[in-house]
């Protein structure tokens, strides 16, 4: 990097000058409005380019806070949320982690009711391991290279278990396709045959978008998130003290609900560019530090990883305990970081949080995995899932330049609307087929020769006037926190 070793006074002065210059430019950048930052950002790039290797597109990550003059949603929206919670209590199975369930079974087969140090249980050599790190694939041994290993075979058989929920969806899907319908509706009478379940949600965050905010509101439900419900907004705490106070209130409710346990924040910095997600104020009393230092001043007591033991009660419930404090530990991860490819302990603690309090969103299930078109799903004026198209590369001739007329004919045949979203994980790219430059972007995506998922764009209606400024109306996403009294 461009900061030099501080062997003498001149080097120290150079480092101080560099840091002060960087701080000055960052402050100047904050003062400018969104459209006037380019020259300052270029100066930052030039300053850092002196001996530092970095990706220019990912160097800076920015959060923006716009002061809201007034923010109100009516009781009609909260009533719709109540209906959504009722829907999931009857209809949709919870999103259990297959990795976590497999770990429970393998742990109980090996240790039964024993209480084992967590670092031992998750060690792929002496214990079981976790996720991609197990006793079968945790290490790379040159003596085994070239030998077949079924545990490393990433091909899998899709589970086609035809549950009552799947059977209902098949019936409605086939009716919609036969009649050429763009959506299916799930009715209360459809839910009568399903047993109501406790959703295990002491508190939760509801993610939604308001599509119309009148007497009969229409919303797009993104999901109901359990576990550490502050994870969705914690990275924005530093922007406003009101947000920080709100997150603190959420975290305190966790401690009240688990009053006989230790609620501990997991603190881990797994890789570069994750610091902006992981580093945030935290008012929890306890913290679990894993390959990181306790950088937050708020955590008063640190629980070392080697102080934690694990057991699986009757092969069902995973229990973590502190040997020193002789109490059960409830780990919390108040960030939205994807931990699937993390180290075993970090991935395990994250999955444990999600199993302690479930999350819910509509899922078509594996039976519909490869369908080229899935209609919109609605329940009680709530869009549970937008319409979706799966585009395979072989739908277009290879080595041929696709022109606009051919693309338009294909779009009409597939009944794809003018405005859609290309979705890749959590990322979405807006495409309007009436805009030539956006059509070119769409064609460039097709040339990448990978399957593309398209999703209908739902914000075109003139009724969407929830978020307004001098520039006009905007799309919106709301996060509403709920808790049991």
Question: Which residue ranges define each predicted feature?
Answer:
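Type-3 copper protein
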Residues: 4-276, 317-323, 420-485
């Amino acid at each position: 990097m461009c900061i030099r070793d501080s062997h003498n006074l001149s080097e120290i002065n150079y480092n101080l000058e560099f840091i002060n210059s960087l701080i000055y430019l960052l402050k100047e950048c904050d003062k400018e409005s969104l459209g006037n930052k380019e020259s300052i950002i270029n100066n930052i790039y030039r300053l850092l380019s002196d001996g530092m290797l970095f990706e220019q597109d990912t160097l800076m990550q920015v959060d923006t806070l716009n002061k809201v003059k007034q923010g109100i949603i009516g009781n009609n929206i909260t009533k719709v949320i109540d209906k959504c919670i009722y829907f999931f209590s009857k209809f949709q199975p919870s999103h259990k982690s297959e990795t976590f369930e497999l770990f429970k079974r393998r742990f109980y087969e090996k240790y039964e009711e024993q209480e084992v140090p967590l670092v031992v249980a998750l060690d792929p050599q002496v214990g079981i391991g976790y996720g991609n790190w197990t006793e079968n694939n945790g290490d790379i041994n040159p003596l085994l290279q070239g030998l077949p290993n079924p545990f490393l075979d990433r091909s899998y058989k899709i589970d086609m278990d035809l549950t009552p929920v799947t059977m209902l969806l098949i019936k409605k899907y086939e009716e919609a396709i036969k009649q050429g319908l763009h959506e299916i509706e799930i009715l209360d009478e459809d839910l009568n045959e399903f047993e109501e379940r406790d959703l295990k949600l002491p508190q939760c965050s509801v993610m939604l978008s308001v599509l119309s905010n009148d007497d009969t509101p229409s919303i797009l439900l993104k999901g109901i998130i359990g576990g550490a419900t502050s994870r969705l907004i914690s990275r924005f705490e530093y922007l406003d003290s009101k947000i920080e106070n709100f997150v603190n209130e959420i975290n305190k409710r966790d401690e009240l609900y688990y009053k006989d346990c230790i609620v501990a924040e997991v603190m881990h910095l797994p890789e570069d560019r994750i610091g902006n997600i992981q580093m945030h104020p935290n008012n929890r009393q306890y913290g679990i530090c894993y390959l990181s230092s306790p950088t937050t001043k708020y955590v008063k007591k640190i629980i070392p990883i080697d102080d934690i033991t694990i057991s699986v009660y009757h092969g069902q419930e995973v229990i973590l305990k502190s040997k020193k404090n002789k109490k059960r530990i409830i780990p919390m991860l108040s960030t939205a970081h994807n931990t699937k490819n993390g180290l075993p302990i970090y991935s395990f603690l994250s999955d444990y949080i999600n199993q302690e309090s479930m999350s819910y969103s509509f899922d078509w299930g594996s039976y519909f995995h490869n369908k080229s078109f899935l209609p919109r799903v609605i329940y009680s004026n709530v869009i549970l899932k937008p319409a979706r198209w799966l585009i395979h590369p072989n739908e277009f001739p290879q080595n041929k330049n696709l022109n606009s007329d051919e693309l338009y004919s294909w779009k009409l045949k597939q009944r794809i609307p003018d405005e859609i979203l290309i979705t890749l994980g959590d990322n979405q790219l807006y495409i309007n087929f009436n805009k030539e430059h956006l059509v070119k972007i769409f064609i460039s995506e097709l040339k990448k020769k990978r399957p593309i998922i398209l999703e209908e764009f739902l914000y075109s209606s003139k009724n969407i006037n929830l978020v307004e400024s001098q520039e006009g109306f905007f799309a919106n996403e709301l996060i509403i926190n709920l808790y049991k009294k």
